[in-house]
């Protein structure tokens, strides 16, 4: 065993002062001295439990002792009588065994592959032990879940990721998926439950037993987000539901995740075999599938962007050449050829590497280097985490922990360890790039083209000398370009740019200037780009991105030239530069029905319990998607109606995620309202009004929302901290508002306006569905019924959605006096016009002035309220374009008039979108859109001016 280094020997004196009673410096072995100096986690544990230290001193941990974990845990749980004592015993058992593993790992008593096996088997033992105890307890309470034939149904648990692969790290969370075989009901209990309810309750108790922090800590952080539909899906699914999901909706990334899926516990029964057979075709295709290379490349790009965004320096998992790249290399071969080559279907990485070598898919030397690098990185990761039982992959910055790791890795000192690490990661990176890398490089022609601009950038030319490269520009534009370059250089002198940043900037600027200054609008474009560059000059990673990826630079220039709004967004949030790397996605926004799934995948990379990172991730996702929508808008690949569709679907995905996050936080604190125990869903709905309700959002639109619930009076929550059910929903709505409006470094998510709720700002933030119906029928003003025309549920349970739709239909189909309605709608519009219109003398406000968008909206709303009692089909849609179609189809409005209003409406909306992209206000010269305005005014007089 390597003697402790000098810094660690000095630290030992600090450890001596904390030794548990009965132990002295002289009474401890050299092994104990080494472990307790290395790991604060081990030291803290044996201080609390001195008997563990005595046990280790008398007999060292053995390589195969993982075979005894199940028996040891069974003994520990023998006296457990309730959930609280179960939680305590699970936590103590986990800590005791983790100390033994840390001891064996630190002293190299067991090889690194076996350490991974021990860590994984410990987690599996605790999961299965907790499940089995709780299953029996739930059966005593509610009966045994059975299928229609009376066969008892088990809870099957899929361990995902490193747990499934038997490669768990020291301080890891665990990714699980719960399933049960067949539908049915419980039998033999005090009351019957259907199987879905039984397994949901069992799953909730199991997660609590493992995940909830107590005075004894927690067992594992449990992450359930890999299950079908993520947090918005059922906690536990039947086999049939799982099969349907993976056959019909399973995504590529879910297929990759399923490669490592493994059933926990003794799993050779018929149900387990059925589940494995059902999942296998989804994971491994019968044919050779090369499409996975691009998918994995995209996933790697997402991870690289995350590293940049979160500033993850020295990360041995996610960094270039890190653990994740080795996993990606192996997965490429598994997913391309695994359907044909059974030897590639192993869940574990090292056996799969052996199979890759045996099949000659990689050179032997590459495989050998990957194996050595993997074991080196995994040992370093586990040692790093065992210092404080902390989930981290970032190398330490302090001298003590650096000395610990150098000693644990058998290096002379920290620089030697860093040198070895650098060599291993370089080997991994080389293989990765050869297999699925996509690095770009400059061509000789590009170098030659940018050479004259190198002198311009380095200020070696006088103004007259620069004339040849700027000959196509007018004199004033030429002077402006040179002034912008000079001013930018002066600005850089004020910035603390390191040598590497200067070097990258000097490589980048000649190429950037060559591209920008070849344009006729060079001065304008450069004036938009230099603020962005000034914002990132101290962040070398973003300069390197633009320097190393010429394609990204070209897209940056094109987009900034086309839109100051995009230039401003990129300057404010440089992380968006990552979106420029792939033109295939930059100009092709996410499919309208895929935003929720894309966001779910994006959020999986963020710890569920880290609220700050969750808020940041939501905002970053929104900004990236907005950029892609705007880029497609500029490129002409999205017509105006589609722009609004995308912006609306994006907003709905964000609402869904925010409600999920708020709900999770509330339930963790209070439990859920008890009326939900007997049903699926959350008893909650979010209704979108205005532009959101009408699928007509713009780039900077706020969200008009109201919140509904269906909680009866006198219902309490079922958590440890009980509160009134209606109070729960009020706090939920407040939490949602907070998550939307909290300002992070990435700004706010959306401005949310909830004043359209019953009684406006004076009313309750969340309303019961019954109270909402009563208010609409007896108290609401006509303008509130107008607003209801453009309202729809954007998040909610099916039954609440149906209830809202019924109320909306009932209100809209109520017979009204035509003259009274006409007067009230017209007077409301006149009030709005007096308040909002004609603010810009000699200008036309596209939205608020006569003949503008609001007039068209009022015409549509008036006609729906006026005629829906005769033509109930008019209530079907909430957007103006389809309402105008319905008016024509139902004989209310002449088809020619409806089409003309639709064209006018989309033309004006298109102009508003483009003004927003140019960061211009929504008004134009009075001479603009005279044809459209005249048409709208004529229609207004026809329908809303009293005869």
Swiss-Prot record:
HAMAP family with a match to the protein in the record: GlnE
GO BP annotation list: regulation of glutamine family amino acid metabolic process
Cofactor(s) in the UniProt record: Mg(2+)
Chemical reaction(s) catalysed: [glutamine synthetase]-O(4)-(5'-adenylyl)-L-tyrosine + phosphate = [glutamine synthetase]-L-tyrosine + ADP; [glutamine synthetase]-L-tyrosine + ATP = [glutamine synthetase]-O(4)-(5'-adenylyl)-L-tyrosine + diphosphate
Pfam families (UniProt xref): GlnD_UR_UTase, GlnE
Residue segments, region Adenylyl transferase: 450-947
Entry GO CC: cytosol
Protein's recorded name: Bifunctional glutamine synthetase adenylyltransferase/adenylyl-removing enzyme
GO function term, MF aspect, one: [glutamine synthetase]-adenylyl-L-tyrosine phosphorylase activity
This protein's record includes keyword Nuclease: no
InterPro entries: GlnE, GlnE_rpt_dom, NT_sf, PII_UdlTrfase/GS_AdlTrfase
Ranges where the record places region Adenylyl removase: 1-440
UniProt function note: Involved in the regulation of glutamine synthetase GlnA, a key enzyme in the process to assimilate ammonia. When cellular nitrogen levels are high, the C-terminal adenylyl transferase (AT) inactivates GlnA by covalent transfer of an adenylyl group from ATP to specific tyrosine residue of GlnA, thus reducing its activity. Conversely, when nitrogen levels are low, the N-terminal adenylyl removase (AR) activates GlnA by removing the adenylyl group by phosphorolysis, increasing its activity.
Alphabetical UniProt keywords: ATP-binding, Magnesium, Multifunctional enzyme, Nucleotide-binding, Nucleotidyltransferase, Transferase
Assigned EC number: 2.7.7.89, 2.7.7.42
């Amino acid at each position: 065993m390597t003697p402790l280094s000098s810094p660690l020997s000095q630290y030992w004196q600090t450890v001596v002062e904390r030794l548990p009673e009965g132990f002295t410096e002289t009474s401890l072995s050299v092994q104990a001295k080494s472990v307790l100096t290395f790991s604060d986690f081990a030291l803290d544990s044996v201080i609390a439990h001195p008997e563990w230290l005595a046990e280790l001193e008398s007999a060292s941990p053995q390589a195969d002792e993982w075979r005894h974990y199940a028996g040891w845990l069974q003994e520990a749980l023998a006296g457990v009588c309730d959930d609280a004592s179960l939680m305590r015993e699970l936590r103590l058992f986990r800590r005791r065994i983790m100390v033994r593993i840390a001891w064996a790992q630190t002293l190299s008593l067991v090889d690194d592959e076996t350490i991974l096996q021990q860590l994984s088997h410990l987690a599996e033992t605790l999961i299965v032990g907790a499940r089995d105890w709780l299953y029996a307890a739930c059966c005593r309470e509610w009966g045994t879940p059975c299928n229609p034939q009376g066969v008892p149904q088990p809870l099957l648990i899929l361990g995902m990721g490193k747990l499934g692969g038997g490669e768990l790290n020291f301080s890891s969370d665990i990714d699980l998926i719960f399933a049960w075989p067949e539908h049915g009901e419980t039998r033999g209990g005090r009351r019957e439950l259907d199987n879905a309810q039984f397994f949901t309750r069992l799953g909730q108790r199991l997660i609590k037993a493992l995940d909830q922090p107590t005075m004894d800590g927690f067992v594992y952080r449990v992450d359930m987000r890999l299950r079908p539909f993520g947090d918005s899906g059922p906690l536990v699914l039947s086999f049939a539901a799982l099969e349907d999901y993976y056959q019909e909706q399973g995504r590529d990334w879910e297929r990759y995740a399923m490669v490592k899926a493994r059933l926990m516990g003794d799993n050779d029964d018929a149900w387990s075999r059925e589940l494995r057979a059902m999942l296998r075709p989804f994971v491994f295709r019968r044919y050779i599938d090369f499409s996975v290379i691009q998918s994995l490349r995209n996933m790697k790009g997402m991870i690289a962007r995350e590293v940049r965004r979160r500033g993850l320096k020295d990360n041995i998992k996610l960094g270039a050449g890190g653990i994740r790249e080795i996993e990606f290399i192996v997965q490429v071969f598994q997913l391309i050829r695994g359907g044909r080559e059974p030897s590639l279907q192993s869940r574990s990485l090292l056996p799969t590497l052996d199979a890759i070598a045996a099949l000659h898919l990689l050179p032997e030397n590459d495989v050998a280097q990957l194996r050595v690098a993997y074991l080196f990185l995994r040992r370093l990761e586990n040692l790093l985490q065992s210092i404080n039982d902390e989930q981290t992959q970032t190398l330490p910055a302090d001298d003590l922990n650096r000395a610990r790791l150098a000693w644990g890795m058998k290096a002379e000192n920290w620089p030697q360890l860093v040198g070895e690490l650098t060599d291993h990661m370089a080997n991994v990176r080389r293989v990765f790039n050869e297999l699925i890398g996509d690095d770009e490089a400059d061509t000789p022609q590009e170098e030659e083209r940018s050479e004259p601009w190198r002198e311009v950038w380095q200020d070696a030319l006088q103004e007259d000398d620069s004339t040849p490269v700027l000959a196509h520009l007018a004199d004033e534009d030429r002077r402006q370009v040179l002034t912008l370059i000079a001013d930018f250089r002066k600005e850089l002198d004020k910035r603390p740019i390191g040598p590497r940043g200067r070097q990258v900037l000097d490589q980048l600027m000649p190429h950037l200037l060559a591209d920008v200054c070849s344009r006729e609008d060079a001065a304008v474009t450069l004036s938009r780009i230099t603020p962005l560059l000034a914002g990132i000059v101290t962040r070398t990673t973003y300069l390197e991105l633009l320097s190393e990826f010429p394609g990204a630079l070209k897209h940056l220039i094109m987009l900034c030239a086309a839109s100051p709004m995009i230039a401003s967004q990129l300057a404010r949030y440089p992380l968006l530069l990552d979106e420029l790397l792939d033109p295939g996605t930059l100009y092709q926004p996410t499919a309208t029905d895929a935003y929720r799934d894309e966001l779910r995948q994006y959020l999986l990379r963020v710890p569920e319990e880290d609220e700050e990172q969750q808020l940041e991730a939501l905002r970053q996702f929104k900004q990236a998607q907005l950029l892609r929508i705007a880029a497609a808008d500029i490129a002409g690949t999205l017509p105006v109606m589609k722009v609004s569709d995308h912006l609306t679907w994006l907003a709905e995905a964000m609402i869904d995620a925010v409600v999920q996050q708020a709900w999770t936080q509330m339930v963790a604190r209070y439990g859920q309202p008890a009326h939900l125990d007997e049903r699926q869903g959350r008893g909650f709905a979010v209704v979108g009004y205005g532009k959101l309700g009408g699928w007509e959002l713009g780039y900077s639109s706020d969200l008009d929302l109201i919140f509904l619930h269906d909680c009866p009076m006198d219902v309490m929550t079922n958590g440890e901290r009980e509160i009134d059910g209606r109070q729960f929903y009020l706090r939920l709505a407040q939490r949602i508002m907070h998550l939307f409006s909290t300002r992070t470094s990435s700004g706010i998510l959306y401005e949310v306006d909830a004043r359209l709720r019953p009684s406006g700002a004076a009313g309750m933030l969340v309303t019961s569905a019954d109270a909402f119906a009563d208010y609409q029928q007896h108290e609401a003003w006509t303008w509130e019924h107008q607003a209801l025309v453009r309202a729809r549920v954007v998040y909610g349970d099916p039954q609440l959605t149906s209830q809202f739709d019924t109320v909306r239909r009932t209100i809209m189909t109520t017979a009204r006096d035509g003259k009274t309605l006409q007067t009230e709608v017209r007077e409301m519009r006149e009030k709005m016009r007096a308040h909002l219109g004609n603010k810009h003398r000699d200008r036309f406000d596209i939205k608020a002035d006569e003949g503008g968008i609001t007039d068209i909206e009022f015409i549509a709303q008036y006609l729906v309220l006026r005629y829906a009692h005769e033509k109930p089909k008019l209530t079907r849609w909430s957007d103006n374009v389809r309402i105008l179609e319905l008016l024509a189809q139902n004989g209310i409005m002449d088809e020619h008039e409806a089409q003309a209003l639709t064209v006018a409406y989309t033309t004006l909306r298109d102009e508003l979108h483009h003004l927003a992209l140019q960061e211009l206000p929504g008004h134009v010269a009075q001479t603009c859109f005279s044809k459209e305005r005249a048409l709208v005014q004529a229609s207004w007089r026809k329908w809303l001016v009293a005869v």
